[in-house]
């Protein structure tokens, strides 16, 4: 390898690390959008059942990068209005696409619920002084508090999040029997908590002094 190539490679690596430290969440968000676009492309061009597994894999990586995105934002303290809004749009778009292509009858009502709750959470995050999870932990019922306890690092939250991915994945892969229905309770939990979150934050916003 020539010296010129080494210098060029070092500069590209330096730029990448600078960008990662400067805008980590934005870079991860861009990768997530690329994965979603690839999944949509494979879905509409798929000619065999095996390619459906690639769609699930690409969207699964998208979900995992969402966890990395949150970690990087907390780790480097890079939170901004743009970053919050971008993360919200990527999350909701990914969920909507995956649930719609799953063919499940519950896809449309669940996505409408998610978008409504997401918009309220986004507005609350951008405008309110306290974090929206603090409201839920302070005023929510026992189930809501348990779901959001320990920053959602608990069994209930894991069940809801995993089921939210596994149920549409199972349906999309044309699985049946227990491999499909085992995830229904987790999705029901996810939907109930989302509904309660929507109602509670909407009421909190209405009764806030700024309103």
Predicted region positions:
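Membrane-embedded alpha-helical segments that form the functional core of polytopic membrane enzymes
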Residues: 22-85, 98-115, 179-190
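A feature for the membrane-embedded catalytic helix bundles of lipid/isoprenoid biosynthetic enzymes
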Residues: 1-29, 88-211
């Amino acid at each position: 390898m020539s010296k010129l190539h080494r210098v060029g490679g070092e500069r590209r690596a330096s730029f990448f690390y600078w960008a990662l430290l400067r805008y980590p969440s934005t870079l991860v968000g861009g990768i997530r959008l690329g994965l979603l676009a690839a999944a949509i492309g494979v879905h509409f061009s798929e000619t065999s059942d095996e390619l459906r597994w690639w769609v699930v894999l690409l969207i699964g990586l998208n979900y995992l990068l969402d966890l990395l995105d949150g970690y990087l934002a907390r780790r480097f303290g890079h939170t901004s209005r743009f970053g919050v809004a971008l993360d919200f749009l990527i999350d909701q778009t990914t969920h909507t696409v995956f649930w719609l292509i799953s063919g499940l009858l519950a896809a449309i009502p669940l996505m409408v619920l998610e978008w409504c709750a997401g918009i309220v959470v986004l507005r609350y995050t951008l405008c309110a002084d306290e974090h929206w999870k603090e409201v839920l932990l302070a005023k929510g019922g026992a189930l809501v508090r348990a779901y959001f306890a320990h920053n959602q690092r608990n069994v209930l939250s894991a069940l809801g999040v995993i089921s939210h991915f596994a149920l549409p994945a199972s349906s999309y892969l044309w699985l049946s029997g227990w491999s499909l229905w085992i995830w229904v309770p987790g999705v029901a939990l996810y939907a109930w908590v989302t509904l309660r979150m929507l109602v509670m934050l909407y009421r909190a916003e209405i009764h806030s002094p700024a309103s």
